[in-house]
Design a protein with these regions (language model features):
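Dinucleotide-binding Rossmann-like beta1-alpha1 core, especially the glycine-rich loop
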Residues: 1-55, 59, 184-185
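Generic secondary-structure signature for well-ordered alpha-helical cores
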Residues: 3-14, 43-46, 61, 93-97, ...
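Alpha-helical packing segments of well-folded alpha/beta enzyme cores
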Residues: 4, 8, 83, 87, ...
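Short loop/edge segments at beta-strand edges and connector loops
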Residues: 52, 100-102, 239
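A short, glycine/Asx- and small/polar-enriched loop/turn
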Residues: 63-67, 108-116, 170-171, 259
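Helical element adjacent to the flavin cofactor pocket in flavoenzyme catalytic cores
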Residues: 70-134
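C-terminal catalytic lobe of FAD-dependent flavoproteins
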Residues: 80, 90, 145-148, 153-162, ...
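Glycine-/small-residue-rich beta->alpha transition segments that form the dinucleotide
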Residues: 123, 132-144, 169, 199-200
Protein backbone atom coordinates (compact mmCIF):
# COMPACT_ATOMS: atom_id res chain seq x y z
CA UNK A 1 0.00 0.00 0.00
CA UNK A 2 2.76 2.48 0.85
CA UNK A 3 4.37 1.85 -2.54
CA UNK A 4 1.11 2.68 -4.30
CA UNK A 5 0.66 5.63 -1.91
CA UNK A 6 3.97 7.13 -3.06
CA UNK A 7 3.35 6.45 -6.74
CA UNK A 8 -0.06 8.14 -6.68
CA UNK A 9 1.32 11.15 -4.80
CA UNK A 10 3.90 11.51 -7.56
CA UNK A 11 1.80 10.94 -10.69
CA UNK A 12 -1.64 12.12 -9.52
CA UNK A 13 -0.91 14.69 -6.84
CA UNK A 14 -3.76 16.88 -8.08
CA UNK A 15 -6.20 14.10 -7.04
CA UNK A 16 -4.80 13.64 -3.54
CA UNK A 17 -5.06 15.61 -0.32
CA UNK A 18 -2.17 14.92 2.03
CA UNK A 19 -3.94 14.75 5.36
CA UNK A 20 -1.75 12.40 7.40
CA UNK A 21 -3.55 9.86 9.54
CA UNK A 22 -4.01 8.66 13.09
CA UNK A 23 -4.41 5.10 14.31
CA UNK A 24 -6.06 5.49 17.69
CA UNK A 25 -6.29 3.00 20.53
CA UNK A 26 -9.43 3.15 22.69
CA UNK A 27 -9.81 1.88 26.28
CA UNK A 28 -11.46 -1.32 25.03
CA UNK A 29 -8.49 -2.00 22.71
CA UNK A 30 -5.10 -3.45 23.57
CA UNK A 31 -2.04 -1.20 23.47
CA UNK A 32 -0.02 -4.32 22.66
CA UNK A 33 -1.45 -4.19 19.14
CA UNK A 34 -0.09 -0.64 18.75
CA UNK A 35 3.44 -1.94 19.19
CA UNK A 36 2.83 -4.73 16.66
CA UNK A 37 1.41 -2.16 14.26
CA UNK A 38 4.40 0.19 14.55
CA UNK A 39 6.86 -2.68 14.10
CA UNK A 40 5.01 -3.88 10.98
CA UNK A 41 4.96 -0.34 9.56
CA UNK A 42 8.70 0.02 10.02
CA UNK A 43 9.25 -3.33 8.34
CA UNK A 44 7.24 -2.03 5.37
CA UNK A 45 9.19 1.27 5.35
CA UNK A 46 6.21 3.30 6.57
CA UNK A 47 6.99 6.21 8.88
CA UNK A 48 4.78 5.44 11.88
CA UNK A 49 5.28 7.40 15.09
CA UNK A 50 3.58 6.87 18.45
CA UNK A 51 2.47 10.25 19.80
CA UNK A 52 0.95 11.46 23.04
CA UNK A 53 -2.87 11.17 23.11
CA UNK A 54 -3.20 14.86 23.97
CA UNK A 55 -1.08 15.81 20.96
CA UNK A 56 -3.29 13.57 18.82
CA UNK A 57 -6.37 15.47 20.02
CA UNK A 58 -4.73 18.80 19.22
CA UNK A 59 -3.90 17.56 15.73
CA UNK A 60 -7.39 16.06 15.25
CA UNK A 61 -9.99 17.54 17.64
CA UNK A 62 -12.72 15.26 16.23
CA UNK A 63 -10.99 12.12 17.51
CA UNK A 64 -12.48 10.33 20.51
CA UNK A 65 -11.13 12.14 23.62
CA UNK A 66 -11.11 8.81 25.48
CA UNK A 67 -8.26 7.49 23.32
CA UNK A 68 -5.32 5.99 25.23
CA UNK A 69 -2.84 5.77 22.35
CA UNK A 70 -2.19 7.19 18.90
CA UNK A 71 0.12 6.54 15.96
CA UNK A 72 0.71 9.14 13.26
CA UNK A 73 1.19 7.90 9.68
CA UNK A 74 1.73 9.63 6.29
CA UNK A 75 -1.80 9.13 4.99
CA UNK A 76 -3.86 10.99 2.44
CA UNK A 77 -7.22 10.89 0.71
CA UNK A 78 -7.94 10.30 -2.97
CA UNK A 79 -10.70 11.96 -4.98
CA UNK A 80 -11.83 8.80 -6.84
CA UNK A 81 -13.91 10.68 -9.42
CA UNK A 82 -11.06 13.02 -10.35
CA UNK A 83 -8.52 10.17 -10.37
CA UNK A 84 -10.71 8.02 -12.61
CA UNK A 85 -11.27 10.90 -15.02
CA UNK A 86 -7.55 11.73 -15.04
CA UNK A 87 -6.68 8.11 -15.74
CA UNK A 88 -9.09 8.03 -18.69
CA UNK A 89 -7.86 11.35 -20.10
CA UNK A 90 -4.23 10.31 -19.83
CA UNK A 91 -4.98 6.99 -21.52
CA UNK A 92 -6.80 8.75 -24.36
CA UNK A 93 -3.89 11.16 -24.84
CA UNK A 94 -1.69 8.09 -25.29
CA UNK A 95 -3.94 6.56 -27.94
CA UNK A 96 -6.53 4.62 -25.96
CA UNK A 97 -10.16 4.41 -27.03
CA UNK A 98 -12.61 4.46 -24.10
CA UNK A 99 -15.91 2.64 -24.57
CA UNK A 100 -18.53 3.37 -21.94
CA UNK A 101 -21.75 1.35 -21.59
CA UNK A 102 -20.00 -1.63 -23.17
CA UNK A 103 -20.10 -5.13 -21.71
CA UNK A 104 -17.70 -7.95 -22.56
CA UNK A 105 -19.87 -10.94 -23.49
CA UNK A 106 -17.22 -13.28 -24.85
CA UNK A 107 -13.58 -13.72 -25.83
CA UNK A 108 -12.17 -14.24 -29.31
CA UNK A 109 -9.78 -17.17 -29.37
CA UNK A 110 -7.33 -18.73 -31.76
CA UNK A 111 -6.42 -22.06 -30.22
CA UNK A 112 -5.21 -21.32 -26.70
CA UNK A 113 -4.60 -17.66 -27.48
CA UNK A 114 -7.07 -14.86 -26.67
CA UNK A 115 -7.15 -12.48 -29.63
CA UNK A 116 -9.91 -10.07 -28.66
CA UNK A 117 -13.32 -9.64 -27.10
CA UNK A 118 -16.97 -9.68 -28.07
CA UNK A 119 -18.80 -6.68 -26.64
CA UNK A 120 -22.37 -5.49 -26.30
CA UNK A 121 -23.01 -1.76 -26.67
CA UNK A 122 -25.93 -1.09 -24.33
CA UNK A 123 -26.58 2.41 -25.68
CA UNK A 124 -26.86 1.41 -29.33
CA UNK A 125 -27.99 -2.16 -28.62
CA UNK A 126 -25.49 -3.85 -30.90
CA UNK A 127 -22.83 -6.53 -30.62
CA UNK A 128 -19.43 -6.42 -32.30
CA UNK A 129 -15.86 -7.65 -31.96
CA UNK A 130 -12.64 -5.95 -30.91
CA UNK A 131 -9.30 -7.53 -31.86
CA UNK A 132 -6.09 -7.08 -29.88
CA UNK A 133 -2.65 -8.63 -29.47
CA UNK A 134 -3.02 -8.54 -25.67
CA UNK A 135 -6.22 -8.76 -23.60
CA UNK A 136 -6.06 -7.79 -19.91
CA UNK A 137 -8.75 -9.04 -17.55
CA UNK A 138 -9.20 -6.08 -15.20
CA UNK A 139 -12.92 -6.59 -14.55
CA UNK A 140 -12.75 -6.72 -10.77
CA UNK A 141 -15.36 -8.97 -9.22
CA UNK A 142 -16.69 -9.71 -12.73
CA UNK A 143 -13.25 -11.07 -13.64
CA UNK A 144 -14.44 -14.56 -12.73
CA UNK A 145 -17.02 -14.41 -15.51
CA UNK A 146 -14.45 -13.10 -18.01
CA UNK A 147 -12.01 -15.88 -17.10
CA UNK A 148 -14.71 -18.49 -17.70
CA UNK A 149 -14.95 -17.31 -21.32
CA UNK A 150 -11.38 -18.64 -21.64
CA UNK A 151 -12.27 -21.89 -19.85
CA UNK A 152 -10.34 -20.76 -16.77
CA UNK A 153 -11.58 -21.10 -13.23
CA UNK A 154 -10.83 -18.36 -10.69
CA UNK A 155 -12.85 -18.70 -7.52
CA UNK A 156 -13.64 -15.19 -6.34
CA UNK A 157 -14.61 -14.28 -2.80
CA UNK A 158 -17.33 -11.60 -3.07
CA UNK A 159 -16.91 -9.50 0.07
CA UNK A 160 -19.63 -6.87 0.25
CA UNK A 161 -18.66 -3.59 1.86
CA UNK A 162 -20.98 -0.77 2.92
CA UNK A 163 -20.04 2.81 3.78
CA UNK A 164 -21.74 6.09 4.65
CA UNK A 165 -21.13 9.61 3.31
CA UNK A 166 -21.63 12.23 6.02
CA UNK A 167 -23.21 15.63 5.45
CA UNK A 168 -20.08 17.65 6.16
CA UNK A 169 -16.40 17.21 6.90
CA UNK A 170 -15.99 16.34 10.57
CA UNK A 171 -12.29 15.39 10.58
CA UNK A 172 -9.17 16.67 8.82
CA UNK A 173 -6.92 13.65 9.33
CA UNK A 174 -7.78 10.08 8.41
CA UNK A 175 -8.78 8.37 11.68
CA UNK A 176 -8.28 4.61 11.95
CA UNK A 177 -8.93 2.22 14.82
CA UNK A 178 -5.64 0.64 15.90
CA UNK A 179 -6.82 -2.95 16.05
CA UNK A 180 -7.16 -5.92 13.73
CA UNK A 181 -9.37 -5.02 10.72
CA UNK A 182 -13.07 -4.89 11.61
CA UNK A 183 -16.26 -3.06 10.67
CA UNK A 184 -16.27 0.75 10.64
CA UNK A 185 -12.65 1.23 11.60
CA UNK A 186 -11.74 4.12 9.29
CA UNK A 187 -13.09 7.69 9.02
CA UNK A 188 -11.88 9.49 5.90
CA UNK A 189 -12.14 13.22 5.13
CA UNK A 190 -12.73 14.06 1.48
CA UNK A 191 -13.30 17.56 0.13
CA UNK A 192 -16.40 18.81 2.02
CA UNK A 193 -17.55 15.46 3.44
CA UNK A 194 -16.36 12.60 5.61
CA UNK A 195 -16.77 8.89 4.89
CA UNK A 196 -17.14 6.11 7.45
CA UNK A 197 -16.42 2.55 6.39
CA UNK A 198 -16.56 -0.25 5.93
CA UNK A 199 -18.32 -3.49 6.61
CA UNK A 200 -17.28 -6.87 5.22
CA UNK A 201 -19.83 -9.58 4.52
CA UNK A 202 -19.46 -12.60 2.28
CA UNK A 203 -22.23 -12.82 -0.32
CA UNK A 204 -23.09 -15.37 -2.99
CA UNK A 205 -21.50 -14.65 -6.37
CA UNK A 206 -24.88 -14.49 -8.09
CA UNK A 207 -25.73 -11.46 -5.92
CA UNK A 208 -22.85 -9.20 -6.95
CA UNK A 209 -25.14 -6.97 -9.04
CA UNK A 210 -27.78 -6.66 -6.31
CA UNK A 211 -26.19 -4.27 -3.85
CA UNK A 212 -28.30 -2.75 -1.09
CA UNK A 213 -27.14 -1.19 2.16
CA UNK A 214 -29.11 -2.76 5.00
CA UNK A 215 -30.39 -0.96 8.13
CA UNK A 216 -28.16 -3.26 10.17
CA UNK A 217 -25.08 -2.09 8.25
CA UNK A 218 -26.04 1.56 8.78
CA UNK A 219 -26.43 0.94 12.52
CA UNK A 220 -23.03 -0.75 12.73
CA UNK A 221 -21.30 2.05 10.83
CA UNK A 222 -22.83 4.77 13.00
CA UNK A 223 -22.28 2.93 16.29
CA UNK A 224 -18.67 1.95 15.60
CA UNK A 225 -17.89 5.18 13.75
CA UNK A 226 -18.95 7.25 16.75
CA UNK A 227 -16.20 5.51 18.71
CA UNK A 228 -13.67 7.06 16.33
CA UNK A 229 -15.29 10.52 16.36
CA UNK A 230 -18.23 11.02 18.75
CA UNK A 231 -19.68 13.89 16.70
CA UNK A 232 -20.44 11.38 13.94
CA UNK A 233 -23.50 10.19 15.85
CA UNK A 234 -25.12 13.64 15.41
CA UNK A 235 -24.03 14.18 11.82
CA UNK A 236 -26.47 13.99 8.91
CA UNK A 237 -25.97 11.08 6.50
CA UNK A 238 -26.00 12.11 2.84
CA UNK A 239 -25.67 8.75 1.11
CA UNK A 240 -25.04 5.08 1.69
CA UNK A 241 -23.03 2.96 -0.72
CA UNK A 242 -22.30 -0.73 -1.11
CA UNK A 243 -19.84 -2.49 -3.37
CA UNK A 244 -18.09 -5.82 -3.72
CA UNK A 245 -14.38 -6.34 -3.16
CA UNK A 246 -12.83 -8.48 -5.94
CA UNK A 247 -10.97 -10.89 -3.67
CA UNK A 248 -9.70 -14.35 -4.51
CA UNK A 249 -11.14 -17.00 -2.21
CA UNK A 250 -9.35 -18.18 0.91
CA UNK A 251 -10.76 -21.25 2.62
CA UNK A 252 -9.77 -20.14 6.13
CA UNK A 253 -11.26 -16.63 6.11
CA UNK A 254 -15.07 -16.45 6.15
CA UNK A 255 -15.21 -12.61 6.28
CA UNK A 256 -12.62 -11.70 3.65
CA UNK A 257 -10.81 -9.36 6.04
CA UNK A 258 -7.49 -11.17 5.71
CA UNK A 259 -7.65 -12.05 2.02
CA UNK A 260 -4.86 -10.37 0.05
CA UNK A 261 -5.70 -7.15 -1.83
CA UNK A 262 -2.82 -7.84 -4.21
CA UNK A 263 -3.10 -8.33 -7.96
CA UNK A 264 -3.62 -11.95 -9.05
Amino acid sequence: CIEENRILKRIAHHCIERTDGLFITLPQDSLDYQQQFIAACRQADINAEAIDPQLALRLEPAANPALIGAVRVPDGTVDPFRLTAANMLDAREHGAQILTYHQVVGLLRSGDRVTGVRVYDHQNQRRYELHASVVVNAAGIWGQQIAEYADLRIRMFPAKGALLILGHRINNMVINRCRKPADADILVPGDTISLIGTTSTHIDYDQIDNMLVTPQEVDILIREGALLAPTLAQTRILRAYAGVRPLVASDDDPSGRNVSRGIV
